[in-house]
Amino acid sequence: MSEIKDIVVQGLWKNNSALVQLLGLCPLLAVTSTATNALGLGLATTLVLTLTNLTVSALRRWTPAEIRIPIYVMIIASVVSAVQMLINAYAFGLYQSLGIFIPLIVTNCIVVGRAEAFAAKKGPWLSALDGFSIGMGATGAMFVLGSLREILGNGTLFDGADSLLGGWAKVLRVEIFHTDSPFLLAMLPPGAFIGLGLMLAVKYLIDEKMKKRRAETAPSAVPAGETGKV
């Protein structure tokens, strides 16, 4: 149970692929102009990570070490192709919006890195959990950044949610404030860099506060020879 908890905590927070490892920055900065786009690509990446880790782990005993990386890339490309066809079939609006960034998941360092560092050494179910946790950690970071940029840029949240979830999701659109001219800095790549920098700073402050709190609540060490004294 402790290993499962550690995998989840590492993926979601301590070893977050976007906020700690700073991997996959190209889609993170390019696609997060809206919360819907960020959530769509994040969930697609999570599905790819989970299925890839599961497959790599299941085949690890029969994968020659000398050619393991090309085999990993072939597995990732197959999974990404299947996910791309699913999005094309069931969320065509999102498919058009994400464009080239769906097939580019193949080259994402997160996917190859987890296959090599974890799935090639652990069992299938732990590997699937690792892929899911890492993917949800990245999805969370992308969603927060996309939400901030959409609110600051357009004054809305979940605009275009119907392209991801279907026609009923139009009711999810929220207008935070009305604006006739979008705040372009928030919508363009410089705004994404600034937003990511602020998120990194907030995570650092939270980590430091948690570290300080643990140090204050930790029991002080008892000097040797003092335990028997009254």
Swiss-Prot record:
The chain crosses the membrane at residues 18-38, 39-59, 63-83, 86-106, 125-145, 182-202. Pfam families: Rnf-Nqr (PF02508). It is an enzyme of class 7 (translocase). Its EC number is 7.-.-.-. InterPro entries: NqrDE/RnfAE (IPR003667), RnfE (IPR010968). GO terms for cellular component: plasma membrane. It is a multi-pass membrane protein. Its main location: membrane. Part of a membrane-bound complex that couples electron transfer with translocation of ions across the membrane. Required to maintain the reduced state of SoxR. The complex is composed of six subunits: RsxA, RsxB, RsxC, RsxD, RsxE and RsxG. Belongs to the NqrDE/RnfAE family. This is Ion-translocating oxidoreductase complex subunit E. It comes from Salmonella typhimurium (strain LT2 / SGSC1412 / ATCC 700720). The lineage of its organism: Bacteria, Pseudomonadati, Pseudomonadota, Gammaproteobacteria, Enterobacterales.
